[in-house]
């Protein structure tokens, strides 16, 4: 119990700093909110954009074998029949008859019995365990009040069309991948790509989660960075290994996440998705325990074969070198943007005890992803210091998001930027007017040094 309370407390600290410093706000807050919806504030959206741009750089621009795509959220409903999502994209659901609370049965059993307990359990077995154990409802505390477990489809349904007579029942996409498969033939034709190659995209997906929880970790509306890598059948294991290593390296070397907070977990056969022959998750050690950050799945030729069958289109690839046609196999690294956001904030968060006995909260982001690259502080709002500060601000803004802050004591301004994760604070003082130098204070060590204004831009560029 103490461990759980400690985990809950540390997650609350993350939520608190995110709200206090404008990273994440509750959705629809002035109307009382809407459960499990969040808005990303000024610093949150900067962090998200930096993460997405860094991913696009290393998964598209720096690779000759990957191109980008932005496919529609709304697709012909037959797509989801073909992909298997209509019949297979389900979670087990139970209800409390007393308080009407809906609960995801497998996660509830694992909360009661331990992590991994529900892996591979059928609905019948879940019902048996729940009945025999006589668990209490976590909401009202009543025992013996659960309904039988049943499948609950996670796709959001909506209508397409202006009138009831002409409207078509469609779904908000639960993953971005299918839009890539639908455009495989188009991309091959227009870009003349040769296998092996990948198609990457960033976009919103929607899943009507039974138990959406843990801040932005599991939400009904979320963003994905997915890439489908098409390869010749028989080579998929080699590419699978390549992408697991490539993704892990990107997280540690580019994003700057500590290695001890990451691990690779291979899925058991019983927990594989219906389309996968093998999946490995890169997991992050969140405040609530280890959780999936990045799933790398070997989807075989399942999706392209299904779309061939349902659409009647030939989606085989013509290999001109080997003079043969085949349906490519696919390796998919799928990364949740919101989960990555929570991971980097959690990894960077620290409450540091200072020599004077005070505690400072600091987000130790890598400068590559920090929402603010540097902050400019005029020591006073007079004597030409604001004018000089504005000159420096205008010049440095070409390097990225630079913040100008002239409110309050310097010490309080430092603390505010520490909580935002700003790596460098630049103070313009009276010595600046004499010798054209500024004081640069580094976030992590809090060390300070004087830098000439005419060298400041290059100095900062080398560290970003």
From Swiss-Prot:
Keyword Transmembrane attached: no
Record keyword Chaperone present: no
Coiled-coil features, chain-numbered ranges: none
Broad class of enzyme this protein falls into: ligase
Subunit and interaction comment: Homodimer.
Record key words, sorted: Aminoacyl-tRNA synthetase, ATP-binding, Cytoplasm, Ligase, Nucleotide-binding, Protein biosynthesis
The species this protein was found in: Leptospira interrogans serogroup Icterohaemorrhagiae serovar Lai (strain 56601)
Reaction catalysis annotation: tRNA(Gly) + glycine + ATP = glycyl-tRNA(Gly) + AMP + diphosphate
EC numbers, comma separated: 6.1.1.14
Family: Belongs to the class-II aminoacyl-tRNA synthetase family.
Short name of any one Pfam family annotated for the protein: tRNA-synt_2b
Stored InterPro entries: aa-tRNA-synt_IIb, aa-tRNA-synth_II, aa-tRNA-synth_II/BPL/LPL, Anticodon-bd, Anticodon-bd_dom_sf, Gly-tRNA_synthase/POLG2, Gly_tRNA_ligase_bac, GlyRS-like_core
S-S bonds: none
Protein name from the UniProt record: Glycine--tRNA ligase
Residues given in the record as ATP binding sites: 207-209, 217-222, 292-293, 336-339
Compartments reported by the entry: Cytoplasm
Residues that bind substrate: 104, 175, 222-226, 332-336
GO terms under biological process: glycyl-tRNA aminoacylation
Domain of life assignment: Bacteria
Record function comment: Catalyzes the attachment of glycine to tRNA(Gly).
A single MF term (Gene Ontology): glycine-tRNA ligase activity
Broad class of the protein's primary localization: cytoplasm
GO cellular component terms attached to this protein's record: cytoplasm
Lineage: Bacteria, Pseudomonadati, Spirochaetota, Spirochaetia, Leptospirales
